[in-house]
Curated annotation (Swiss-Prot):
Identification of the protein by name: Envelope glycoprotein L
Principal cellular location given in the protein's record: virion
Family the entry assigns: Belongs to the herpesviridae glycoprotein L family.
Keywords from the named record: Fusion of virus membrane with host cell membrane, Fusion of virus membrane with host membrane, Glycoprotein, Host cell membrane, Host Golgi apparatus, Host membrane, Membrane, Signal, Viral envelope protein, Viral penetration into host cytoplasm, Virion, Virus entry into host cell
Cited Gene3D superfamilies: Viral glycoprotein L
Region entry Disordered, spans: 142-167
HAMAP family in alphabetical order: HSV_GL_alphagamma (MF_04034)
Gene name per UniProt: gL
Subunit structure: Interacts with glycoprotein H (gH); this interaction is necessary for the correct processing and cell surface expression of gH. The heterodimer gH/gL seems to interact with gB trimers during fusion. When in complex with gH, interacts with host EPHA2; this interaction triggers EPHA2 phosphorylation and endocytosis, allowing virus entry.
Biased composition regions of type Polar residues, renumbered to the chain: 142-154
Membrane topology: Peripheral membrane protein
Higher taxonomy: Viruses, Duplodnaviria, Heunggongvirae, Peploviricota, Herviviricetes
Cellular compartment(s): Virion membrane; Host cell membrane; Host Golgi apparatus, Host trans-Golgi network
Length: 167
């Protein structure tokens, strides 16, 4: 049970301490190669959007750090919740009260999302945001939601730049 128990405890700790926070702003799930996702041990928190937020779109954010920059990666909330339900259920009688509270939350939110599931709530692209990260003189384009020491919204920059051209 060794590594599996460590894995389950780590995920549960991350989720129980962070599931009360709403993932704001909402984000768009981007198709990505697995190699571009943060490594498991690089994820320092997971934030779920509740069913009454983000227009009912089931998303979650993985937060990881790269140097001084915290990167939030938008992921499919159904998949992550379902995976974690399976992990906590495998704990069986080893599940702590925190594990059981997490399981209750995950199952409740999955049920709520399933009831409201339709073409609109399946499309996270309405929350798409393009940003530029600027840190220590280096810029990096990324689609999604990112927070760091210095960030600037690309769409805001484009609007400001377009306004200057019109003068």
């Amino acid at each position: 049970m060794g590594i599996f128990a460590l894995f389950a405890v780590l995920w549960t700790t991350l989720l129980v301490t962070s599931h009360a926070y709403v993932a704001l702003p909402c984000c768009a799930i981007q198709a990505s190669a697995a190699s571009t996702l943060p490594l498991f041990f690089a994820v320092h928190s997971i934030h779920f959007a509740d069913p009454n937020h983000c227009n009912g779109v089931c998303i979650a954010k993985l937060r990881s750090k790269t140097g001084d920059i915290t990167v939030e990666t938008c992921v499919n909330g159904f998949n992550l919740r379902s995976f974690l339900v399976a992990v906590v259920r495998r704990l069986g009688s080893w599940a702590s009260q925190e594990n059981l509270r997490l399981l209750w939350y995950l199952q409740r939110s999955l049920t709520a999302y399933t009831v409201g599931f339709n073409a609109t709530t399946a499309d996270s692209s309405i929350h798409n945001v393009n940003i530029i990260i600027i840190s220590v003189g280096k810029a990096m384009n990324r689609t999604g939601s990112v927070s760091g020491s210095q960030t600037r919204a690309k769409s805001s920059s484009r609007r400001a730049h377009a306004g200057q051209k019109g003068k």
